[in-house]
Amino acid sequence: MLRVASVGSGSKGNATLVASEETTLLIDCGFPAREMLSRLDQINVDIADIDAILVTHEHSDHIGGVAAVSRAAGAPIYATHGTLTSGKLEGARTIVEIESDSEFAIGDIEVSAITVPHDAREPVQYVFKHAARRIGVLTDLGMVSPHVQRAYEGCDLLLLEFNHDLAMLRRGPYPAALKRRVSGDFGHLNNDQALGMLEAMGESVPGTVIAGHISEQNTSVDAVSTLLGPLIQRAEMNVIYATQSQGFDWISSDASGAVSKVA
């Protein structure tokens, strides 16, 4: 069984966990160590259970707590060369440099590091495989390139960024430069882009989609839910919404795509 959980998803901090029966992986940690311990407790995870930490990129909402949590967990950090050159992992326990678009294994979980367009030094996102089950984690990208589209085909569960409603962003309070950054090709996916990615998958659309990195200023769970409504009915797809405050509890899915909450 392969399962996934999050202790928070959004611009104030991100941390996602993917686990098999034998291996527990943490993807990013944008929370201070003490806060992270409290958040892990909410999903019944002991920090010592974390076998490795995979970093997507060097922005503080993803990397801010990684070095401290690595030391506390005694877990190695996996990151690209570009991410390592940011200097934000100083004091980390053990670092393993990975290549973009590479495949490797940690314990009994196979990992693919996928290059994505984002305004960071060498950003990647990840696909995880175990016992014929695939979980994709895909946030912090400004567009869905053909390469990204192909890499995430055939996932059973997909954590996908629905960052902003473009109209809400344009009329919102952000400075003009930040609006251009967020909406640009190296920024964040807007809701329509994320929906378009799912629709392009056709019959291979994941049975379960987790909408994540939802901006608290520029969209809402209700807006994303309304947008996804027709696809949910047509594809009989399960949708879960990751929040900034709590993320989402452990879930897995069976071959039919049915969602199960797991401890």
PLM regions and their residue ranges:
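Short, basic/aromatic-enriched C-terminal tail that caps enzymatic domains
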Residues: 235-263
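Active-site metal-binding motif and surrounding structural segment of the metallo-beta-lactamase
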Residues: 34-79
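Active-site neighborhood of phospho(di)ester-bond hydrolases with catalytic His/Asp-centered motifs
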Residues: 27-30, 50-58, 78-81, 136-140, ...
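Conserved beta-strand hairpin/beta-sheet module of binuclear metal-dependent hydrolase folds
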Residues: 1-43, 124-140, 157
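Active-site environment of divalent metal-dependent phosphoester hydrolases
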Residues: 59-63, 84-86, 120-121, 143-146, ...
